[in-house]
Design a protein with these regions (language model features):
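Cell-wall polysaccharide-cleaving catalytic domain and substrate-binding groove, primarily
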Residues: 1-127
Length: 127
């Protein structure tokens, strides 16, 4: 199958399930590691305040909003066609490291130079 322009791709349902499953769920704001920012639900950080609580349906709705923002970042930064699985992986990475880190990464530079294998290997640097 050929790569497609990313404007024609959206995050797959499988990738969304993978993101929320790997993030895990917390019903109250926590600081997952020392020095990190407050996180709630399925990894949401934007606008989260300590003491905040949520429910699974609200957390999933918030995760969908977050995914939309990270998809926007991937679409803005990546200028080359992708396979669905590549797009899913890069949106998932952006969800984990943030839009700024993703867009400023060596991974994106390699990807935009059509160094697909090199970009893929860069994911491992964020593990």
């Amino acid at each position: 199958m050929m790569r497609r322009l990313i404007a024609t791709i959206s995050l797959s349902a499988v990738a969304l399930v993978g993101i929320v499953a790997s993030e895990g769920y917390t019903d109250r704001a926590v600081i997952p590691v020392p020095g990190d920012v407050p996180t709630i639900g399925f990894g949401t950080t934007e606008g989260v305040k300590m003491g905040e609580t949520t429910t699974p349906p609200k957390a999933l709705a918030r995760a969908l909003q977050d995914v939309g923002r990270y998809e926007g970042a991937v679409r803005q930064c990546v200028k080359v066609p992708l396979h669905q699985h590549e797009y899913d992986a890069y949106v998932s990475l952006a969800y984990n490291i943030g839009s700024r880190a993703f867009c400023g990464s060596t991974l994106v530079r390699k990807l935009n130079a059509e160094d697909y294998p090199g970009a893929c290997l860069e994911i491992l640097r964020w593990d």
